[in-house]
């Protein structure tokens, strides 16, 4: 019971404990997915485009939840096309384009890379 309460608190779902999954908002369902994933006590969590379909304010709320999960000593590998969602929370950013690694490193330096700006962000494309 205590572990369930802790997971619900960590994922921001404590007030929804008795709500059916089908009655949850998209953000709440994403949080439920996270709660189910961390219930087994993983050391690593793989998130595959979890921000998809969310508005920017919802993405910020989701980031807060993911940051709470990280504070539980769970490493997170986050695959995402919405790069701005990652910038404030990742320690390392790897950009892959059609299976080829384009850059790997500190998020700020990766985003400033001319190749990344051209290929991924569409800046400077002729």
Language-model segments: which ranges?
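A short, surface-exposed alpha-helical micro-motif characterized by mixed small hydrophobic
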Residues: 86-88
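H-loop/switch region of ABC-family ATPase nucleotide-binding domains
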Residues: 80-81
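Catalytic Walker B motif of ABC-type/P-loop ATPase nucleotide-binding domains
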Residues: 45-48
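ABC ATPase "signature
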Residues: 104-105
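Conserved catalytic motifs of ABC-family nucleotide-binding domains
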Residues: 41
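Conserved ABC nucleotide-binding domain
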Residues: 7-28
